[in-house]
């Protein structure tokens, strides 16, 4: 039988703690900081509840309650695989793959294993999916664009705007086919 160790407690002034957090963030990239008020202000589903937290990487923020544990089904498009021989985005190929990925992410909701009923309830009620990109720096290398340049920012805007538009379009088409999710109205 092991006795739990008593952890030493200490007091730290709020400014000192804030400086320590910011120093660590600057030096290591951790801890990640997310402000709940900003998340709730910008949430497209304010009508469904309050965002209390994010996932570990803070890439998603979803509503939680006693009946719901936030779940998100995430996927990425590998941008370098969507560049043609001249280094331009192949928009037809990108649209085909984004559309397929959105359908697959929606299918994951139906075939997923849920360890707790609150996760299943949340996933079926909101059907949350997220699509991002990966390989951005590889794409810049292929395009011979320096990472810290205005051209890199422009390419980020172009590629993410296309992926976002195509994903929203694919999701809309899927809703016409399968119906909207139950918490959509609001």
Indicate where each model-derived feature is located.
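Single conserved hydrophobic/aromatic residue that forms the stacking wall/gate
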Residues: 1-12
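A general alpha-helix detector
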Residues: 20, 135-139, 155
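Extended amphipathic alpha-helical segments enriched in small hydrophobics
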Residues: 127-146
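Active-site-proximal structural scaffolding
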Residues: 14-17, 26, 67-72, 98-101, ...
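Function-dense linear segments that define catalytic or interfacial modules
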Residues: 25-123, 135-139
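Internal maturation/activation junctions in enzymes
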Residues: 97-120, 145-186
């Amino acid at each position: 039988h092991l006795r739990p160790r008593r952890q030493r407690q200490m007091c730290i002034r709020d400014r000192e703690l804030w400086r320590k957090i910011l120093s660590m963030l600057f030096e290591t990239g951790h801890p990640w900081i997310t402000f709940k008020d900003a998340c709730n202000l910008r949430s497209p589903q304010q009508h469904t509840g309050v965002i209390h937290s994010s996932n570990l990487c803070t890439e998603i923020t979803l509503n939680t309650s006693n009946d719901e544990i936030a779940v998100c089904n995430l996927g990425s498009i590998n941008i370098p695989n969507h560049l043609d021989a001249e280094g331009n985005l192949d928009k037809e190929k990108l649209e085909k793959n984004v559309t397929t990925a959105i359908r697959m992410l929606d299918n994951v909701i139906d075939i997923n294993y849920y360890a707790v009923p609150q996760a299943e309830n949340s996933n079926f009620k909101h059907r949350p999916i997220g699509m991002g990109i990966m390989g951005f720096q590889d794409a810049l290398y292929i395009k011979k664009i320096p990472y810290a340049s205005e051209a890199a920012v422009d390419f980020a805007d172009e590629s993410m705007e296309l992926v976002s538009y195509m994903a929203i379009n694919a999701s809309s088409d899927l809703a016409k086919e399968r119906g909207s999710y139950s918490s959509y109205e609001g």
